[in-house]
Amino acid sequence: MEQRLAERLSAAQLPEANDIAWAGVWLESCGYTGLMFLREALADEQKSLPLARDALGIDLQNVSCAFLAPAIMREVSANGRAFLRNVRHGLFLLPFTVRENMAIGCPIDPAFAVGGERHKNPYAEKLALAAANGLDIDDALWSAVTLT
């Protein structure tokens, strides 16, 4: 599933397609609406944004984190904790923060912080169950995100 989604996103010339696909499937595996958010984001005209810190943190200008999450994580890893504002689909940061053991504020808020250390992975059990049992994804949603 992840590989097929990554191939479709790559065909649509989306940078970081593998990471986007991984995060979408990760979210679905944990019971979140990753693919629904990805479908919404794919309809957006703007899919990238140069990340620049200002006195308040980083203004994401409502560009979807489905596309920005990998770059945000690189920026925070290099420069430390950041306050994000005008966040859209912030839940897409969750898989990356868990993988990197990085703290995250409430990713459904329009503004929150990312950075610091996480000491526990609360999603390991859900991911193991999804790996063992597979995922049940709505056919229409799957078609929408795989661009078929």
Identify the function of each model-found stretch:
Residues 2, 6, 10, 16-54:
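N-terminal low-complexity or amphipathic/hydrophobic leaders
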Residues 10, 37, 41-44, 58, ...:
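Acidic, glycine/proline-rich low-complexity segments that act as flexible tails and inter-domain linkers
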Residues 35-113:
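A glycine-rich, acidic short-motif signal
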Residues 15-16, 108:
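Residue-level detector of short coil/turn "hinge" positions at structural boundaries
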Residues 1, 13, 64-66, 134, ...:
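General structural signal for secondary-structure boundaries
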Residues 84-85, 96-148:
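Glycine-rich, aromatic-bearing surface loops/beta-hairpins
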